[in-house]
Amino acid sequence: MTVSKKVILRRTLLVIQLLLLAPILWFLWHLMMPRNYTSKTAEVLPLQLSSGPFGTSYYAAKHPKGILIVATGDGGWSRQWEEPVALHAAVAGFAVGGWDCRKFADTRSFDQAKLVEAFNAAVAAVRKRAGLAADCPVWFTGWSTGAEWAVAVAASPDRDKHLVGILAAAPGDRSRYGISKADLLGAKPQGPDSFALAELAPAIHGIRIAQFVGELDPLDDIQWLKSLPNGTPYKLVDIPGAPHDMGGAGDRFLSEFDMAIQWMLDTPAES
């Protein structure tokens, strides 16, 4: 092989390696870096918490009939799932509070009690801003980490007393009060600040749970639902062809979301 051919071969191999490496680096960046998307619609409501100040994004409804807290995946608020869900729910008549799990985890250490305090504060701020009654119905929804944290809050006796149910999109079987680098890379949360949803499930009473299951999602878990107490209604909502992000909260997902809320309204909390 001539020198010129060797040079061409080396350069060709280098280009191939770069082409293969680029999507891997992009994927790692996508996992590790928080999303910096800022909604053009939401108003930020300040929260004063024992763990430090924070804020919830408020999406107004013309004639609000209840409150929906939308909790993010571990990457933070994005136009991928959270923003479409918040906008859809506001149009449907819910005063929405957006909860950025990544920002919360990046700015403090916390446990279940502090997480419950924070969710309660978000509900109270949205209730006040929307002018809703103290006994208005409340729902939590979340994607991945957000769904897991919603379960942790619901398992506490100190949660908001008017919680109707949880709309959980793609939770895993374990989570953490926080977000570690290992979590972002897909490792199963372990250690003293982690928790299993199945361990919390027996404490969940008086609400309903709808879990959305993407057909192509390798990360979610449904086994934890079997640990719920007798009388805590739950249902699985299959989303055909959907990966972990539920297909970006498209029309099919949002339609199922609406039907899940109606199911909760039609279903007694204790059977």
Predicted segments with their positions:
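Primarily recognizes the serine-hydrolase "nucleophile elbow" in alpha/beta-hydrolase
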Residues: 129-131, 135-195
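C-terminal catalytic histidine-bearing segment of alpha/beta-hydrolase fold enzymes
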Residues: 232-271
